Curated annotation (Swiss-Prot):
Residues 1-59, 155-197, 216-278 are annotated as: Disordered. The modification Phosphothreonine is found at T233. This is TIMELESS-interacting protein. Expressed in brain. It is found in: Cytoplasm; Nucleus. It comes from Mus musculus (Mouse). Residues 226-239 have a biased composition (Acidic residues). Keywords: Cell cycle, Cell division, Cytoplasm, DNA damage, Mitosis, Nucleus, Phosphoprotein. The gene is Tipin. Transmembrane segments: none annotated. One of its GO terms (cellular component) is chromatin.
Length: 278
């Protein structure tokens, strides 16, 4: 503590022969908390290492191209945009046009909100010549599936059409029993041994041989029956031909015999008449 003098003043020490204290330099204003060891080397010093430039990562901005136009929110979504809208019809053409344009603007904004509606129409008109867009339009006109949801819905409809009726199978015990019997019948076939399989094949071959022998015997008997029928038909034809010849000869002789008998009868009558007269 400085001693106070009698007149109330403090004694001032001599600072002329005292050396000043050294302090480190201040950091640059851009980085106030930076250490001096990490400070950038000066340009004049040749020992400085060149600092690589900073890389800027660019974001891929969305573009209105053919793939975006044919996506789920693109042209396929137009099929269902006007499902719930009702147009007034004749006499209200202006109002109907306004509603149509309003729905189209909403569709365009959902697909690509960065463009105005006029610019969007120009861009879509230019993309109309692309092959992808034309194929998408053809599939829409032919009512073919385009998006994944369309394929899923078609598969569900086909499965419902081909699948059994749940109401019928729920109350019909025979259907369930038949399916269970098929399962039980398929299980023992898997557990067959080689000897059993060979025995089954032998039985099949024996059955086939027996069947072929039976077919041969049946064919031979049929051939014999055919020959017998042909012989019998030949005999019948000969008999019928003989009868036809007899009938053809008979009618020519009959009139001669009848006329001869008539003449004899007349001669006898004349003789009787003469005897009566005598």
């Amino acid at each position: 503590m400085l001693e106070q003098e009698e007149n109330g003043l403090f004694e001032i020490p001599d600072y002329e022969h005292v050396e000043d204290e050294t302090f480190p330099p201040f950091p640059p204003p851009a980085s106030p908390e930076r250490d001096p060891a990490d400070a950038e080397p000066e340009e004049g010093s040749g020992s400085g290492v060149p600092v690589p430039p900073k890389r800027t990562v660019k974001r891929n901005l969305p573009k209105l191209d053919a793939t975006r136009l044919t996506s789920e929110r693109g042209l396929p979504a137009l099929r269902h945009v006007f499902d719930k809208t009702k147009f007034k019809g004749k006499g209200h053409e202006a109002e109907d046009l306004k509603t149509l344009i309003r729905h189209m603007e909403h569709w365009a904004h959902r697909l690509f909100p960065k463009l105005q509606f006029e610019d969007f129409i120009d861009r879509v008109e230019n993309l109309g010549n692309k092959k992808e867009v034309q194929t998408c339009l053809k599939r829409i006109r032919l009512d073919l599936p385009i998006v994944h949801e369309d394929f899923v819905n078609n598969n569900d409809e086909v499965g419902e059409a081909n699948g059994p009726d749940v109401s019928a199978t729920g109350f019909d015990p025979f259907l369930t029993s038949s399916s269970d019997s098929r399962k039980f019948a398929s299980e023992p076939t898997r557990s067959l041994t080689e000897e059993q399989q060979q025995r089954i094949e032998r039985n099949k071959q024996l059955a086939l041989e027996r069947r072929q022998a039976k077919l041969l015997s049946n064919s031979q008997s049929l051939e014999n029956d055919v020959t017998v029928e042909e012989n019998s038909t030949g005999e019948d034809q000969e008999e019928s031909n003989g009868l036809n010849i007899d009938t053809a000869d008979g009618p020519h002789d009959v009139p001669f015999a009848s006329t001869h008998e008539e003449e004899q009868c007349k001669a006898e009558e004349t003789q009787l008449d003469h005897t009566n007269l005598d």
